[in-house]
Design a protein with these regions (language model features):
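Transmembrane helical cores of multi-pass ion-transport proteins
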Residues: 1-347
Length: 347
């Protein structure tokens, strides 16, 4: 539910203030892990306030013109950050392929719990998930076939729709299972509450029972997160920009303003902190996006899904969602930089 709300407004705002056409604003695995780490023992009000404060901090960075600091970040650092993020995303999605459920607080915790719950794996999820990955990767390469003219364009559209095709086929399979009354051999997604979120101010204090928590008390609890998460989100957006800039310039200061507007506005619909999503950005790049206007299509689809499609989310197998994410994010790993770095300095 929070994920849908977080993805809803960012696209509309980034379309206006953003500069990187590949960036897809919304919730990410990286932001979710960081937010969970800082607020896991706190009420949900802290998450919304954290979103607002992240926006304020990003706005201050933009007003102070701190975008030049991003230029000091070397290519290997950006590449390492992107690769590490891709690794975290893939690792967090392995449980979906295995068909197991657990919550992981960190990379080490996820690995430990994968080993701990490995005996609970479900063959249905594994077979369907791996088949989906193979299918998606094969369809991804269709556009490289040596054909010309209209056939090439048709094949390009088929290749482009690979994720949607896999999703619809899997939903149809789930529907057939449910219609026949046969138990599902794999786990499916949960339904979400339909309807749009209500507009309300971020919680600058709250009352729980006989206890009143003031704004200074709330800010003290998230004091570290207010600085760490905005910095990571800026680095994420800039990393995406550099990954697709092909040597071009990156307007880091403007990206700070765009992130600030997305998070401040998002806090009014109870969003979590957001930034550019590596996975969705990879999907957008593969789709041949030309401008930031692509965000409006994604946001409109999320809006329609929130209003009308939430009752059907239970038809989507979890392993299919994991397959789509893994198939997209593995191409963010920068293999080419390893060889020159190895030749430059082996110590």
């Amino acid at each position: 539910q929070v994920g849908l709300y977080s993805a809803l407004i960012g696209g509309f705002i980034y379309m206006i203030f953003g500069t990187v056409k590949q960036v897809s604003m919304g919730p990410t695995s990286l932001m979710a892990l960081l937010t969970y780490e800082y607020t896991k023992n706190l009420p949900s009000q802290y998450v919304v306030l954290l979103t607002f404060m992240c926006g304020i901090f990003e706005m201050l960075m933009g007003l102070l013109r701190l975008g030049f600091l991003v230029d000091l970040i070397s290519t290997p650092v950006t590449s390492g950050f992107t690769t590490a993020t891709a690794f975290i995303i893939v690792l967090s999605q392995v449980k979906g392929i295995l068909g197991v459920k657990f919550k992981g607080d960190s990379v080490i915790d996820i690995i430990e719990k994968l080993i701990e719950h490995f005996h609970e794996r479900r063959n249905g999820d594994i077979y369907l998930g791996l088949a989906a990955i193979v299918f998606i990767l094969i369809m991804r390469e269709l556009h490289n076939l040596p054909v010309k003219g209209k056939i090439k364009r048709i094949i390009w559209y088929v290749s482009l729709s690979r994720n949607t095709t896999v999703l619809l086929i899997s939903m149809f399979i789930t529907y057939l299972y449910e219609s026949s009354g046969t138990p599902l051999p794999y786990l499916t997604s949960e339904t979400a509450k339909p309807g749009l979120p209500s507009l309300q101010f971020p919680p600058f204090g709250y009352t729980s029972g006989n206890t009143t928590v003031t704004l200074p008390q709330m800010l003290y609890e998230i004091r570290s997160a207010m600085f760490v998460i905005p910095l990571v989100s800026v680095l994420a957006n800039v990393s995406i920009a550099k990954a697709y800039a092909n040597g071009g310039t990156v307007e880091a200061t403007q990206e700070m303003f765009a992130l600030a507007m997305c998070n401040i506005a998002g806090s009014f619909i109870r969003s979590m902190p957001t930034c550019g999503a590596f996975t969705r950005s990879a999907l957008i790049q593969a789709s041949g996006v030309r401008t930031t206007m692509s965000n409006i299509y994604a946001s409109c689809l999320i809006l329609l899904a929130t209003l009308f499609l939430t009752p059907y989310f239970h038809l989507i197998p979890r392993c299919i969602l994991s397959s789509v994410l893994i198939s997209a994010v593995i191409f963010l790993v920068d293999y080419q930089i390893v060889k020159p770095l190895w030749k430059t300095n082996r110590e």
